Amino acid sequence: MSQLYDITIVGGGPVGLFAAFYAHLRQAKVQIIDSLPQLGGQPAILYPEKEILDVPGFPNLTGEELTNRLIEQLNGFDTPIHLNETVLEIDKQEEEFAITTSKGSHLTKTVIIAMGGGAFKPRPLELEGVEGYENIHYHVSNIQQYAGKKVTILGGGDSAVDWALAFEKIAPTTLVHRRDNFRALEHSVQALQESSVTIKTPFAPSQLLGNGKTLAKLEITKVKSDETETIDLDHLFVNYGFKSSVGNLKNWGLDLNRHKIIVNSKQESSQAGIYAIGDCCYYDGKIDLIATGLGEAPTAVNNAINYIDPEQKVQPKHSTSL
């Protein structure tokens, strides 16, 4: 028979990891279920060397460092972690929830969903022959291996701008965006404009020039024009964002707003006892940042504790007094 947990956290990214740690501070029996093969979510898998700018008090913190610190924080507690396990159904029983996964079943008194944007994969570059080129990349695992190489980046959001600024320190860097304006933090855009990065706007990639295995040049075409330019490069990085899939979320009987779980001020969903935090939840004024999700975690945990035992105060002691 499955053990009965106080709190089951669905998602092992930064927000889920911190929620598990905080749940232990409330002496809850907690476990984590994640469909990915490793903890840490997108920062660990896609951005291990990218600086995370919205965690207060930790300048120059990378995705890998953030993940390692959160795991280290959790290591002092007994936390069953189920990786490569996808949640299929969450069913309300008399006094608990039955969670059916791709590998089995779990019983829990409450659920905190911290699955971010769900399963994710990069939005691909759609040009003829793109699949065969080995020097077209969608994420960076070791930035130093590109030192001194000619790097071109496609995209206009935070990731594209941040990576351009990071690569500029070690390599000749070109950034190509189809619009004149960038969709990134104002401070980052200003830093980009003051940097040595070669900025090509408004241009879009139009042709790959190489031998089918190694890309040597990229042809770009000015938007609403026939004007073309050719960029010599050693590596091409595509930062067009990600396609996310919430998978079975729509089958869990929760009220949604555009594939996000609607929550109240307790971080509670339309089903009492099920909470949502981080990028997977929605409320008026919601901002999708790691810092926001980290703040939502204690709210969900404390209200879950109160749901389990109404005599437990929602407002706990401060950690400094524990």
Curated annotation (Swiss-Prot):
Q: Which cysteines are joined by disulfide bonds?
A: none
The cofactor remark states: Binds 1 FAD per subunit.
Which terms in the Gene Ontology molecular function aspect does this entry carry? ferredoxin-NADP+ reductase activity; flavin adenine dinucleotide binding; NADP binding
Alphabetical keyword list: FAD, Flavoprotein, NADP, Oxidoreductase
For activity, the cofactor(s) needed are: FAD
Could you tell me what reaction this enzyme catalyses?
Answer: 2 reduced [2Fe-2S]-[ferredoxin] + NADP(+) + H(+) = 2 oxidized [2Fe-2S]-[ferredoxin] + NADPH
**InterPro entries from the UniProt entry:** FAD/NAD-bd_sf (IPR036188), FAD/NAD-binding_dom (IPR023753), Fd--NADP_Rdtase_type_2 (IPR022890), Ferredoxin-NADP_redctase_2 (IPR050097)
Q: Which domain of life is it from?
A: Bacteria
Look up the coiled coil feature and give its residue ranges.
none
The residues that the entry says bind FAD are: 34, 42, 47, 87, 120, 279, 320
Enzyme Commission number, as recorded: 1.18.1.2
Q: List, alphabetically, the HAMAP family matched.
A: FENR2
Family note: Belongs to the ferredoxin--NADP reductase type 2 family.
Q: What interactions and quaternary structure are annotated?
A: Homodimer.
Q: Which PANTHER family match?
A: THIOREDOXIN REDUCTASE 1-RELATED-RELATED (PTHR48105)
Record's protein name = Ferredoxin--NADP reductase
Q: Which organism is it from?
A: Streptococcus pneumoniae (strain Hungary19A-6)
